[in-house]
Amino acid sequence: MTDLAARLAANADDIADTLVSLLPRAEIDGVRCAEARLLDAMHYGSEGGKRLRAFLAVETATVFGTDRGHALRVGAALECIHAYSLVHDDLPSMDDDALRRGRPTTHIAFDEATAILAGDALQTMAFTILASDATHENPFIRCELVTCLARASGARGMVGGQMIDIEAEKADSPLSLTEISRLQRMKTGALIEVSCSMGAILGQASAESRRAVEYYARDFGLAFQIRDDLLDAIGDVAAVGKAVAKDADAGKATFVDLLGIDGPIARKLITGCSWG
């Protein structure tokens, strides 16, 4: 295992522990509460994964000398948003996926209505975490964290990107490279970019440092999506942990369609993602 892989795994364990401590529990004094099924689904939908967004936030915050406990809370909030997006993305009305992270998706493991509510609750949980003074003693920093995450995950970010993706499936012609780049910057890249940005905010980084972090994260987000498209095109279910070839079956335009398996633009983006 490389040093990076080891750090990613260690951070994933820390984030998992943080989420367990922050998400509401289904039992109160040993008795399951009336909404226990919802709470079980919240925990289920937020389990597993690489915790990449949390890792980016924690590592960026560490660069700027932030308390790790504060950074882990920000990472947990990001993972709540990411988990909610996956739970909803897997629904029959969206991608209709039955497998996520190597096990049944939340609406399969529970039911569709519970999955919708679990996603809703995970979304609001993210902002509950960020608004707490346990995340940072400075209310202005907490407010900026909330604002940045709301913007990145909303209509001009992740959710807007999902809408463009849905509309693209019904379009008469495939998206251009410019259009698909914008789609993916919103749908996938916005949350990756804000992960780094929130780490810098937590560390009270200078404006210049924040810009540098955001430029890095922007291209990293596109490179990450290119990798995801490659896995969908040439990966296998056992390795990826979810259904593959779904994009091609749905007629979606991807970076692989436009650039090929070894496109030069993809290589440029991937090799350009460095702190230097």
PLM feature spans:
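Mg2+-dependent prenyl diphosphate-binding active-site environment of isoprenoid biosynthetic enzymes
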Residues: 20, 28-276
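N-terminal amphipathic/basic leader segments beginning at the initiator methionine
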Residues: 1-26
